[in-house]
Amino acid sequence: MSAVAGCTATTDPGWEVDAFGGVSSLCQPMEADLYGCSDPCWWPAQVPDMMSTYQDWNAQASNSAEDWRNLGTVFPKDK
């Protein structure tokens, strides 16, 4: 997903207006259109703004469906 420089640069079709030219009920429910709504103009609180990658957190679980117990837990470093 690419980030845009402002709300005026958002070009996700259907995000700007609905079929009647209004903005009511867009992105409702949130789960139905999370990708279309996730840009700098609107981002739900439960979705992270950024992700950090931790190397080797899944080194012991090559197949997460079978080896899910071996997935590592990542804790942030204390400051």
Curated annotation (Swiss-Prot):
What are the entry keywords?
Answer: CTQ, Electron transport, Oxidation, Oxidoreductase, Periplasm, Thioether bond, Transport
InterPro entries under this entry? QH-AmDH_gsu_dom, QH-AmDH_gsu_sf, QHNDH_gamma
Effect of altering S62T? In strain: IFO 15366
Write the Enzyme Commission number(s) for this entry: 1.4.9.-
Q: How is this protein's activity kept under control?
A: Inhibited by various carbonyl reagents, such as p-nitrophenylhydrazine (pNPH), 2,4-dinitrophenylhydrazine, semicarbazide and hydroxylamine.
Q: Which coenzyme or cofactor does it need?
A: cysteine tryptophylquinone residue
Cross-link 3-cysteinyl-aspartic acid (Cys-Asp) maps to which residues of the chain? Answer: C27-D33, C41-D49
- Molecular function GO terms recorded: aliphatic amine dehydrogenase activity
Cross-link type 4'-cysteinyl-tryptophylquinone (Cys-Trp), residue numbers? C37-W43
Output a single Gene Ontology CC term carried by this record.
periplasmic space
Free-text description of this protein's post-translational modifications in UniProt: The cysteine tryptophylquinone (CTQ) is generated by oxidation of the indole ring of a tryptophan residue to form tryptophylquinone, followed by covalent cross-linking with a cysteine residue.
Q: Which SUPFAM superfamilies match?
A: Quinohemoprotein amine dehydrogenase C chain (SSF69131)
- Subcellular location as annotated: Periplasm
Cofactor: record remark: Contains 1 cysteine tryptophylquinone per subunit.
Catalysed reactions listed for this entry: an aliphatic amine + A + H2O = an aldehyde + AH2 + NH4(+)
Q: Which positions are catalytic residues?
A: D33
Chain residue numbers at which the record places covalent cross-link 4-cysteinyl-glutamic acid (Cys-Glu): C7-E16
Q: What class of enzyme is it?
A: oxidoreductase
Where does the source fall among the domains of life? Bacteria
Chief localization? periplasm
Modified sites of kind Tryptophylquinone: W43
Record family assignment? Belongs to the quinohemoprotein amine dehydrogenase subunit gamma family.
Quaternary organization: Heterotrimer of an alpha, a beta and a gamma subunit.
Q: What NCBIfam families does the record tag this protein with?
A: QH_gamma
Q: What does this protein do?
A: Catalyzes the oxidative deamination of a wide range of aliphatic monoamines and diamines. The physiological electron acceptor is an azurin-like blue protein.
Q: What is this protein called?
A: Quinohemoprotein amine dehydrogenase subunit gamma
Supply the source organism's classification: Bacteria, Pseudomonadati, Pseudomonadota, Gammaproteobacteria, Pseudomonadales
Q: Which gene encodes it?
A: qhnDH
